[in-house]
Amino acid sequence: MSLLEAIAELHVIPYTDVLAWVVMAAFIAGVAADYRDNLLAARRLTAGAWWLFAVFWFVLIQHFAFVHRSVVQTVLILIAVPACLYVGWLVFAGRDSLLTLSRAVAFMTVIYLPFETSELARGLLIEAVAFQTATVIDALSLADGMEYMQDPDEGSTLMNTFWFPETGRASRVVFECTGIGAMSIFGGLIAAVNAPLRRKAVGIALSISIIWVLNIGRNVFIALANGYQWFAYSWLEGPIMALFGLTDPARVSFFVADRVLAQLLAVVALAGLAWFIARWVPELLDIAEELLSIVGIDVELHHPSVDRTDTDPAD
């Protein structure tokens, strides 16, 4: 067994599930202290939550680098670890403007964790996304002969697999393919800002709807790219197999479609979506300004279609 294979055999997810609940509890405790105007306790609890969050991401480096083999996500996590440590230090030192961002993280975990840790909720979400992905592929006649079937893995009863007889390749919709992570981020950010409830509701409804549609399109693209081997070019095989530690050339199309193109485009799409949603919830720009200021970029962001002096720019 190679060193990479040995590292990939390590299982950290059960421990990170427990740690995630601890992190959520710490952030919620900080939010509760803030609501009770106990600023000193809020700073200490929230700073501790950020430092625990750094530990959480650090533990996940192995999973995303050697099991999931995602370059984009691994780079983001490597940035997240020192960023969480630094934000925690700033909060502890009295930078109270970061309590809004901390409140957003608390809401994100409240949205995300029940789906991630509940087998029933996770299964329902996966099957809903898989069914709609298969429906779009069939409706657009993009894959003649594709079979939508039950997960062949032993012990799984989920209808989440697309098999392409023409190439013998199959793709599965798993939890990471549901878009719940992005929906949790936007839901948490919008819930955390100080804005009228109606505008927040519009922002959440729009962001979740757009993310859901984009995610279905993403799954359609990945399933077809893998099923029909769209990126099976000899000049791609060497670099991609070396980058991701692959031994089977038939997996190159999947990794190019998912780990490279889809994930890079997702970062761009989410940034664009945040700018779009700021039309209804311009308070999101305050969080963006705060994040930029952490890295030494002091700017004042203005959405071109929003008057920041208006109390309800959605009207």
UniProtKB/Swiss-Prot annotation:
Annotated Gene Ontology cellular component terms: plasma membrane
Site-annotated residues for Transition state stabilizer: R259
Gene Ontology biological process terms in this record: proteolysis
Coarse class of the protein's main subcellular location: membrane
UniProtKB keywords: Cell membrane, Hydrolase, Membrane, Protease, Transmembrane, Transmembrane helix
Membrane topology, as annotated: Multi-pass membrane protein
Subcellular location: Cell membrane
InterPro entries from the UniProt entry: ArtA, Exo/Archaeosortase_dom
Gene Ontology MF, one: peptidase activity
Protein's UniProt keywords contain Transmembrane: yes
Enzyme Commission number: 3.4.22.-
Top class in the EC scheme: hydrolase
Similarity comment: family membership: Belongs to the exosortase/archaeosortase family. Archaeosortase A subfamily.
Name recorded for this polypeptide: Archaeosortase A
Source species of the chain: Natronomonas pharaonis (strain ATCC 35678 / DSM 2160 / CIP 103997 / JCM 8858 / NBRC 14720 / NCIMB 2260 / Gabara)
Gene name tied to this protein: artA
